[in-house]
Amino acid sequence: MSFFRIAKTFEVEYGHRLSKHPEKCRFPHGHSLRIEVVARGRELNDQDMVCDYKALKMIVADVVDRLDHAMALNSSDPQLEGLAAIGDRVLLFDDCDPTTEVLARWIFEQVAERLAAGRIVKTTTGANYEIPAGLELERIRVWETSTSWGEYVGLE
């Protein structure tokens, strides 16, 4: 099966605590995440693209903004009450630690939902960008450090 593949990378500052970890990662700490979004399609649009990178960026922007300077926590974390005082920048994961793998799956689900929700995105200047009907989200790769990443693949 032949297809075209595109990728867009985003960077965001983010914190988490791995409540089940036996060593240092059980303490609140942060990362400069690099998020790679990979989409694919079988056909090119009338501009000879799978999808304009600007359209993909606009679809992912809300998800990246939700992560920006957020603290991700397990909803069952015994220290949740104290850490939740951070306020609206807390991102809770239902009964699981916010590992790189869990985060990649969450981002995938958020982006996939947004891709399905609307096929036209509009810029602040009024320009319209089409999300092609055949565009599929393939995977999300999250780099936690320059040498460590986890990914969630939604297509086989």
Write out the residue ranges for each language-model feature.
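Charge-rich, low-complexity N-terminal segments
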Residues: 1-156
